[in-house]
């Protein structure tokens, strides 16, 4: 389940509809992280649902895409498309993450809304003008869902909701969900006090272990596997946006989420992580369904 800005009542309505399923054992699931995606204007998938952007995917050469971005008719149609409800229509949720042109470096880290205000144009012109000025090499970060603190607090406090979501690396160049446990502990527990520390730990350990029938995990108890994370409650956390690395074959990129405040990790009683580094121990087992 995701919370969308354009559908403020969707979470409550959906949870109400699925209560009979929850009573039979079903569990809704959500990510405690704001869903943040990387967007390049050479592959503008985030806008693919808009009719005006169809041309961008018919001829994907740089010259053809640049011609579309310059076209006043395209910009006019895009503005019309944006009048329909859309989860990313708020330009304050789209940030210029990286540029190649030195002249545009001053805009890195600013939202499209901020760039538009500085230039005295609307969001459409700001987005497309900066893209053309950087020869379509710039990259944006889009905060799509789960960005409203009040509605997320309500969702996270619903004990029927399973915390944690991931795509198994299917979009490793666009997003990274693996930082959600440290984000919960740092943001939702310590900073915003939406969950108690004890409840947050339970929701991320014994709760999923019980759901999936993993009987020897999820608790610190004699006779169970010693899978333990030792952390500092005062410093544990992670950011809401992943970091980009270029360490895949051919220099391809992937997204990673860095953690803070993790002192040690044990898997089956062996220390696998200590003082910010892997120890080299491989004490886990592959789970097969």
Can you describe what each PLM-predicted range is?
Residues 192-194, 202-205:
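Glycine-rich loop-to-alpha-helix module at the N-terminal edge of alpha/beta enzyme cores
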Residues 1-193:
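Active-site neighborhoods of metal-dependent hydrolases
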Residues 105-106, 209, 254-257:
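Short loop/turn motifs at secondary-structure junctions and domain boundaries
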Residues 139-152, 197-201, 209-243:
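Acidic, glycine-enriched loop/beta-strand segments at the rims
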Residues 130-131, 204, 227:
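A general structural motif at alpha-helix termini
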Residues 24-28, 159, 218, 226-229, ...:
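Structural beta-strand/beta-sheet cores of well-ordered domains, especially the beta-sheet scaffolds
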Residues 154-161, 178-180, 230-277, 281-283:
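C-terminal cap of metal-dependent C-N hydrolases
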Residues 29, 120, 167, 200, ...:
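Divalent metal-coordination and catalytic microenvironments
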């Amino acid at each position: 389940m995701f919370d969308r800005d354009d559908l403020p009542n969707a979470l409550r309505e959906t949870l109400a509809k699925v209560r009979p399923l929850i009573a039979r054992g079903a569990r809704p699931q959500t990510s405690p992280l704001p869903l943040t995606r990387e967007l390049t204007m050479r592959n503008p998938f985030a806008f693919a649902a808009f009719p005006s952007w169809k041309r961008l995917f018919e001829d994907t050469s740089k010259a053809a895409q640049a011609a579309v971005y310059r076209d006043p008719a395209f910009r006019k149609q895009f503005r019309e498309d944006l009048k329909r409800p859309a989860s990313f229509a708020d330009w304050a949720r789209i940030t210029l993450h990286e540029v190649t042109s030195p002249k545009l470096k001053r805009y890195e880290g600013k939202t499209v809304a901020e760039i538009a205000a500085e230039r005295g144009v609307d969001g459409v012109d700001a987005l497309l003008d900066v893209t053309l000025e950087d020869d379509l090499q710039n990259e944006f970060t889009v905060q799509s869902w789960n960005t409203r603190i009040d509605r997320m607090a309500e969702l996270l406090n619903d004990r029927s909701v399973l915390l944690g979501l991931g795509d198994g690396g299917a979009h490793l160049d666009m997003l990274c969900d693996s930082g959600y446990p440290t984000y919960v502990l740092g943001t939702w527990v310590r900073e915003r006090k939406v969950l108690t520390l004890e409840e947050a730990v339970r929701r991320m350990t014994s709760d999923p272990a019980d759901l999936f029938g993993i009987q020897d995990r999820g608790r610190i108890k004699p006779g169970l596997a010693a899978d333990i994370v030792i952390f500092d409650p005062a410093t544990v956390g992670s950011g809401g946006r992943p970091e980009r690395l270029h360490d895949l074959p051919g220099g391809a990129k992937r997204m990673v989420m860095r953690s803070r405040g993790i002192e040690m990790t044990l898997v089956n009683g062996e220390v696998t992580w200590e003082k910010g580094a892997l120890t080299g121990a491989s004490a886990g087992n592959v789970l097969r369904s």
